[in-house]
Amino acid sequence: MGPEAFLPVALIIGYLFGSIPFGLILTKLAGTQDLRSIGSGNIGATNVLRTGRKGLAAGTLLGDALKGTAAVIISGYLGGPNAAMIAGLGAFLGHLFPVWLKFRGGKGVAVYIGILIGLFWPGAIFFCLVWLATAFAFRYSSVAALVASVLTPIVLWAFGHTALAALFALLTLLLIYMHRENIRRLQAGTEGKIGAKK
């Protein structure tokens, strides 16, 4: 199979990896309440943290990131750099819209980082540094994610990584869409801050 013919396969590989709901799996194994019935109902690490189980939240964050990295590396090995990028897109879509959960998944921050690690790891370091700085300054996890994701494709483009910049610009648009409720709460002044007691 040639590199171009492999691209649809890479998309499927990425989607299947991305659709693994680590947050839901880990919380069920730990015997906690169904993740979809608490907090935001989201299956990501932030909502897992609302169970009070920091270890589970860390495991979810790691699992969600690594599934993006794994999809990219495996597809890149089998089909080359274009396949790696397509797999990254597939992993992101799988995380956001997993078929097993009626297309209701996470918001994409951890898998965004994982895809960056697989495709261009310095970009992942940049994303994390921006996230940390923004979270420290404003104490909003959602703001930190939005700022880091908007700046990442700009920096990739500025350093000549135009194909990666285009991919991550698309992922950023999807990530912003998934944070639309957070944006509404920010506008209303009701978004919860990091460390705030609910």
From Swiss-Prot:
- Recite the UniProt keywords alphabetically: Cell inner membrane, Cell membrane, Lipid biosynthesis, Lipid metabolism, Membrane, Phospholipid biosynthesis, Phospholipid metabolism, Transferase, Transmembrane, Transmembrane helix
Q: How does it sit in the membrane?
A: Multi-pass membrane protein
Its principal location? membrane
Which Pfam families does its entry note?
Answer: G3P_acyltransf
Coiled-coil ranges per UniProt: none
Q: In which pathway does it act?
A: Lipid metabolism; phospholipid metabolism
For this chain, one GO molecular function annotation is:
acyl-phosphate glycerol-3-phosphate acyltransferase activity
Top-rank taxon, per record: Bacteria
Q: Tell where it localizes.
A: Cell inner membrane
Sorted alphabetically, the Gene Ontology cellular component annotations on this record are: plasma membrane
GO terms in the biological process aspect are: phospholipid biosynthetic process
Q: What is its EC number?
A: 2.3.1.275
**Top EC class for this record:** transferase
- Where is the chain membrane-spanning? 6-26, 55-75, 83-103, 113-133, 154-174
Question: What catalytic activity does the UniProt entry give for this protein?
Answer: an acyl phosphate + sn-glycerol 3-phosphate = a 1-acyl-sn-glycero-3-phosphate + phosphate
What do we know about how this protein assembles, alone or with others? Answer: Probably interacts with PlsX.
The family note in this entry says:
Belongs to the PlsY family.
The task this protein performs is described as: Catalyzes the transfer of an acyl group from acyl-phosphate (acyl-PO(4)) to glycerol-3-phosphate (G3P) to form lysophosphatidic acid (LPA). This enzyme utilizes acyl-phosphate as fatty acyl donor, but not acyl-CoA or acyl-ACP.
Show the HAMAP family listed in the entry.
PlsY
User: What is the protein name for this chain?
Assistant: Glycerol-3-phosphate acyltransferase
- Source species: Bradyrhizobium sp. (strain BTAi1 / ATCC BAA-1182)
